[in-house]
Amino acid sequence: MSELLAIPLKRTLEVDFATELSKLIDTTSFQTASFFQSDILKVVDARNNAIAPDISIDGLSALKEYYVILLQLEKKFPNNQIEFTWFQTLSQKSRGTSQYSLQWEKLTIIYNIGCMYSLLALNSNNDAAESLKTSCLYFQNAAGCFKHVLDHQKNLETIPVVDDATLNALTSLMLAQAQECFWFKAVQDKHKDSLIAKLSQQIVDFYCEAINDAQRGKLIRSDWINHLKAKKAYFSAVTYYRIALSFNEKKQFGNVVKALQMGLQFINESTLSSQAKFKTVVESSLKEAQRDNEFIYLQEVPSELPSIKPALMVKPSSSATLLPSIKKDETLFKDLIPIEVMEYCTAYNERQDEYVEQRVTNPLASLNKLLKESLTTFQIPQGLTKVSEAELSHYQASLNNLLINNKNVQVQLDNIEQILNEEAFTDNQLRLKHGTLNWTLPESSTTNTAYYEKLKKLRGYLDEGSAIDKQTNELFQSIDKNLIGSEIRLPESNDPLTNKIKMIIQERNDYIDRTRRKSSEYRILPKIITSYKKNGTVDFEPIFIGHLKYFDEDLRYVNSTKEENIKLIEEVNLSKKNNPGRSGIEPKKMVRIDPRELYIEDLRYSFKLLDEVKENLSAGTAFYENLITSTSNLYNEVQEYDTARRAEKARLDKSLTFEDQ
């Protein structure tokens, strides 16, 4: 067996993986690259071994080892941060292509694994039985690799590794040569001619598919296509020669003549080196068959023969068996925690705090408020103490801090807008300078839309915050500070129900404080890190749902407190109804209010306003913390966007300026 084809390996430029990975680690994780030098060197060595491997099993192993490393890099790093350059080697002119894509690099390596299998198949072929089996397997493995690339490159965001038509042609070529190995083994084993004819017909079908796809593709050169046509013609002749021998055994001598005539027609179309010898055999057999039929058998020679059903014996090997997977004991960067994972933790912490507030602390505070409101007709306000001048100053300072935070966020948002506007301006200027057709970068208006939308949303939040800040400040200024800052000299209530409610309210306030402390100490970070190290994925939602079950006991407490509240309010209402004139409880009066009652009402109102101010200050502080974080995140995103766009514009501007010179 000879005249088989192997697919040449793609060639590449070296990549400074050490520098590129170090930059990525320093910019995308909370660790520094110095902790991962050993892993980085393994990546560097693996690629160096894979870019120009020996045509050997060791070379194949080097390619597969680098493939496994790329699988790990995909799990740990962004796909589009490192540039790779590869040169195709199928056509007469080698052309280079560069892409920022780990996935593209991985599929290119799989393509080269397929090329390596085709080269090993040729090296293994010495016509011995075992070598034929090995070559047959290797050609099927090569077909499996090319098919894998074809099936998966449709998901790439880059240009394909090789155009689809060429990959289809290479897959069919590898299967044709694998089937050829099987056919040759059948010839050696002297199987029936009818079976050998079916085997060779399948080879013809594969070569036919390869020719059609190669002519549609962009890379396979004409001498290869001519070779495929010669192989197709040769095996068409083989098919008819073998079917002629089968007809001869069945004494169908007219069919023998027709089959040999067809075989001679095809062998004349073949340009293979083995064509001449085989042509002599076919011509000799045809002359003998014609002579015998004309003088002895006198059978009619048909105008055509029945179609020959092919016998398919090969298929592309499954990539699951060809390509290795990551071994647990060989995991690289296993302790690397990307910033993305930490951002998930922060987001889940915020959701946990919100969950606790909505399900536990806020309901308890609302229940306490209902209890307090049920006591509004009691003569003596409970829990009121003099507000110190320092405390009032603290509230005023907190209000001032809200205003400062508001201004700082406003400045930061203005800076973000300025960066986006300047980036769009420079893009427009360069587009005017070089012309729209030459300036191929996407317009800023299409790339910065998401940032402007986020900016608009943050400005909306800021305006809402400003309105609430103004309202809170007006509320605080309306409080009678002399009244609440003076000593309150009122006798303690002797009413048992009032004292009971006061104690319950305090217990609930203590429970709120304990729950908040519990939530701040019980964070999801350790669970997320453990899950990420184990699975390498960022699907943490099931973990978070399980994490929140820790607060089920608190939810049950809130439900029991709701029932308690209903009973207490019923007791208060009953007490008012049954004891309208007893000491400590008086019905509301619709007539003239005496100075003591007026003082109590003013005191209640001022403290109510102060409570609202404190609630607004607490909410405002949390609001601005979140807004500052969101604004900083957007600022960082816009800076990264602007930096990337600057680099792209600089490269294109330089390239276009150079072309104009």
Curated annotation (Swiss-Prot):
The keyword Coiled coil applies. The modification N-acetylserine is found at residue 2. It is found in: Cytoplasm; Nucleus. The keyword Coiled coil applies. Residues 3-371 form the BRO1 domain. It comes from the Eukaryota. Keywords: Acetylation, Coiled coil, Cytoplasm, Nucleus. Interacts with SNF7 with its BRO1 domain. Interacts with RIM101 with its C-terminal domain, probably binding to its two YPX[LI] motifs. Required for the proteolytic cleavage of the transcriptional repressor RIM101 in response to alkaline ambient pH, which is necessary for sporulation and invasive growth. May act as a scaffold protein that recruits the calpain-like protease RIM13 via SNF7 to its substrate RIM101. Present with 2881 molecules/cell in log phase SD medium. This is pH-response regulator protein palA/RIM20. It comes from Saccharomyces cerevisiae (strain ATCC 204508 / S288c). The lineage of its organism: Eukaryota, Fungi, Dikarya, Ascomycota, Saccharomycotina.
